[in-house]
Regions:
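Cleavable N-terminal signal peptides
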Residues: 2-3, 13
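N-terminal signal peptide c-region/cleavage motif recognized by signal peptidases
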Residues: 9-11
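A compositional/structural signature for long, glycine/proline-rich flexible linkers
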Residues: 15-313
């Protein structure tokens, strides 16, 4: 990965280089990598949309397959930015990330423009949903659930507009020795085995521990705080054995799992890269909208090598 001139490397004094300092820096490292990769093909302060994600899309790990994602990496170093969005009769969310992987806002079906600003910046006139960031650079990530209406979703993209957001995109990233990186990554991999996804992401610095945040970022970068999204990760079967690609499993989704206006999704990923798994049927997830529930309100989802079975993936 070539990070180009947008990445400023800062050597660390030996006394400062510790496993803990690496763990605290890791979310920033990953955000900068993702930002600079995106900026190689896109303009700061503008939107790029994925369409329906398939296994070839490696922009973000653990994506949802029946969602049209919109990405906009921006900088408010030179002043606030104003974001306007379309009106949508299904699920639409706007998540705002800073470079520390804080998520200061997740706004579902916005009803007014969103103002992105630093705490020291003056408020412009107008009625806004105000979001303050801890860093100049950040990401707006939009999600529009697709329910056999991709054409309408695509047509609404032009209504996502950002005024401003074209400031300085340089972001410092600290360097570490290979030994420190190896030791710190081993710590992250250990934390991943027991981290509660509900505790992995916060709105401001200090909401979650630096250990949980580092593990959360490695497990699923651009994850969202638990008051908006609840994550559940299943890596083993009911005997404790790792899930296998040549086996068949049945997952039961409980009734009453989500609030009015929300929905559930179950997605299958490869354990090696956390991306969607290629399959002939091109079915990568099951959601409230693409599953047939049971009479008791639960939903049975079948995971198998050929996608057979009720609500199969």
């Amino acid at each position: 990965l070539c990070l180009l001139p947008l990445l400023t490397l800062s050597p660390m004094a030996a006394a400062q280089e510790t496993v803990e300092s690496y763990l605290r820096e890791f979310p920033n490292q990953e955000q900068v990598k993702m930002m600079n990769t995106w900026l190689e093909k896109n303009e700061k302060g503008s939107f790029q949309f994925t369409g329906l994600v398939d296994p070839s899309d490696t922009t973000v790990v653990t994506p949802q397959a029946t969602v049209d994602y919109g990405y906009n990496w921006f900088s408010i170093s030179d002043g606030p930015a104003i974001l306007t969005t379309p009106t949508y009769d299904k699920f639409l969310s706007v998540s705002v990330f800073d470079m520390k992987h804080n998520v200061p806002a997740v706004i579902t079906n916005p009803t007014k423009p969103i103002l992105l600003k630093r705490p020291s910046q003056a408020m412009p006139e107008g009625d806004f949903e105000v979001v303050e960031l801890e860093t100049d650079q950040g990401l707006v990530l939009t999600r529009m659930v697709v329910v056999e209406n991709l054409d309408a979703v695509v047509a609404s993209r032009s209504q996502f507009q950002m005024q401003g957001g074209k400031g300085d995109m340089q972001r410092e990233v600290k360097q570490f020795s290979p030994e420190t990186e190896k030791n710190a990554q081993a710590v992250i991999d250990t934390v991943i085995t027991y981290v509660n996804p509900d505790d992995a992401f916060g709105r401001v610095s200090g909401d979650v521990s630096f250990l949980d945040l580092a593990a959360g970022v490695k497990l699923g970068q651009l994850g969202t705080p638990s008051d908006t999204v609840r994550y559940g990760t299943i890596m083993v079967d009911n005997t404790g054995a790792p899930l296998r690609g040549d086996a068949t499993y049945v997952v039961t989704v409980p009734a009453g799992l989500y609030n009015p206006g929300g929905y559930f999704s179950v997605t299958l990923y490869g354990s090696d890269n956390k991306l969607l798994i290629p399959n002939d049927l091109k079915i990568y997830d099951r959601t409230t909208f693409s599953s047939e529930p049971n009479q008791d309100g639960t939903t049975t989802i079948t995971l198998s090598p050929n996608g057979s079975g009720k609500n199969g993936i």
